[in-house]
UniProtKB/Swiss-Prot annotation:
Family: Belongs to the IspF family.
Protein name listed in UniProt: 2-C-methyl-D-erythritol 2,4-cyclodiphosphate synthase
Transmembrane spans: none
Key words, A-Z: Isoprene biosynthesis, Lyase, Metal-binding
Residue(s) at site: Transition state stabilizer: 37, 136
Pfam family, one: YgbB
Organism, as annotated: Francisella tularensis subsp. tularensis (strain SCHU S4 / Schu 4)
PANTHER family, A to Z: 2-C-METHYL-D-ERYTHRITOL 2,4-CYCLODIPHOSPHATE SYNTHASE, CHLOROPLASTIC
């Protein structure tokens, strides 16, 4: 059996030009949005990078350029579905995924189960294979000042 580990990280700053945020494919009511070329889903972006990294295929920016207008305001679930096809083509399967959302606000706990279900559905895996947790920075740094949100994701693949 062959194993591969990937790590992904993403961060987006808040903008008053949008309302509500999308994280893990779930829309969360909030007075600000996340600045991005796509929908700004920091969790899906980090997850894409983790899978691509484990496959040795670079990062999300290599496959979906942020200068390409076809990806302007696109639902990030599209990226994850395309990366799932790459995963299948390389004949790897997901063992597990572990995600950490770092945000002072809004609170993530009420939305985590919906995120897990959404991601499991796209990746065609069991919800039990995805863990999502959230933390704050205890009001330190740009996240603590509520200027943005970051995520880290680790995935383990096997074949």
């Amino acid at each position: 059996m062959s194993f591969r580990i990937g790590h992904g990280y993403d961060v987006h700053k808040f903008t008053s030009a949008k309302q509500n945020i999308i994280i893990g494919g779930v829309e969360i009511a909030y007075h600000l949005g996340l600045e991005a070329h796509s929908d700004g889903d920091v969790l899906i972006h980090a997850l894409c990078d983790a899978i691509l990294g484990a496959l040795g295929l670079g990062d999300i920016g290599k496959h979906f350029l942020d200068t390409d207008n076809q990806f302007k305001n696109i639902d990030s679930k599209f990226f994850l579905a395309e990366i799932k096809k790459m995963l299948d083509k390389k004949q790897y399967s997901i063992s597990n995924i572990d995600c950490t959302i770092i945000a002072q606000a809004p609170k993530m706990l009420p939305h985590i189960e919906k995120m897990r279900a959404c991601l499991a559905n796209i990746l065609e895996i069991q919800i039990s294979q995805i863990n999502i947790k959230a933390t704050t920075t205890e009001r330190l740094g740009f996240i603590g000042r509520e200027e943005g949100i970051a995520t880290h994701v680790v995935c383990l693949l096997y074949r």
